[in-house]
Every structure is written in structure tokens, then in C-alpha cells.
């Protein structure tokens, strides 16, 4: 099934929240957090990946003149490994490159698949945040990519 990327809308939140719960519980964002992010369209860029069955992934970027930050990215478990996460990340990086000279992100230290994707896209680890993800207490690896 073909997957298309488009801007996230408030109507996507039920599907995004269901994926968020499946992928990231107990360290999930809330509906109010996402609604707040979507209202800040001047500095936020959120996209979803969808096919005929609905939303299969999403990603978000916070972008300022001096730096951008990948705030979230996720792909349905049954669609992982198909390149959807890479397409979502590439969409965020294209937007980040228009706005900012550097992109930062935090990734769960135990998420080797995501760390590998970020490294393939030019990110390097620059630090670690102990017990960053709450309530699980999982560490985060801080990664950085400078615009080439």
C-alpha cells in the first residue's frame, strides 16, 4: 500500500495518540500536548504518513532561527522497516534546513534502530540525559546534525 506524507491536523490526533500509546507507553505525550504543538505553526512542523487504512506514522519538528529540534517520530509497529520513518525524518530535515543551521534530538538509549537511522542521516551523539524519559526513567542519547 502506498504511503503519503502530509501536514498533521487536529483530526489526526486519535490515530497519532493510539500509535503513541502502543510505541512509547508509559512515556507518552497527551492530546493537550499535541493540540498545543499544532497551534504553534510558526515554529512547529508536524507531518503524518498515511495510507488507505489511515495514519501509520507521524513526526514533529520545533524550528527556530538558531536551531531546530526533532520533537517526536514514530511508525506503526507493523509498518516499521519499510522506510516510513526515514521519509518522515527526511521531511523534517528538509524543513529544518530551510529554517535552522543545526538540528538536535533526543532518542531513547535502548532504541538502536532509531539511533542507526539518525546516524545515517548525519547525526552524531553529543551527550546523554540520564533518566530523561519519564516515568520509565530511560536515558536519552542527545544527537546533533549540522546543515551541510
Tell where the protein language model's regions lie, with residue ranges.
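Short glycine/proline-centered loop/turn elements that form peptide/ligand docking sites
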Residues: 89, 110-114, 131-136
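A generic structural signal for beta-strand entry/edge sites
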Residues: 65-67, 102, 140
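Conserved active-site tyrosine of GNAT-family acetyltransferases
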Residues: 118, 123, 143
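A cross-domain feature marking catalytic cores of carbohydrate-active enzymes
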Residues: 63, 107-109
Amino acid at each position: 500500500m502506498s504511503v503519503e506524507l502530509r501536514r498533521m491536523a487536529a483530526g489526526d490526533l486519535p490515530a497519532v495518540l493510539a500509535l503513541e500509546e502502543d510505541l512509547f507507553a508509559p512515556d507518552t505525550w497527551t492530546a493537550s500536548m499535541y493540540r498545543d504543538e499544532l497551534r504553534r505553526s510558526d515554529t512547529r512542523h508536524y507531518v503524518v504518513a498515511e495510507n488507505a487504512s489511515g495514519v501509520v506514522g507521524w513526526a514533529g519538528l520545533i524550528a527556530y532561527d538558531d536551531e531546530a529540534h526533532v520533537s517526536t517520530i514514530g511508525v506503526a509497529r507493523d509498518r516499521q522497516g519499510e522506510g516510513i520513518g526515514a521519509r518522515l525524518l527526511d521531511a523534517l530535515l528538509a524543513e529544518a534546513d530551510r529554517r535552522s543551521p543545526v538540528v538536535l534530538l533526543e532518542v531513547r538509549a535502548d532504541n538502536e534502530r532509531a539511533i542507526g537511522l539518525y546516524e545515517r542521516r548525519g547525526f552524531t551523539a553529543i551527550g546523554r540525559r540520564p533518566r530523561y524519559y519519564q516515568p520509565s526513567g530511560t536515558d536519552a542519547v542527545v544527537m546533533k546534525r549540522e546543515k551541510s
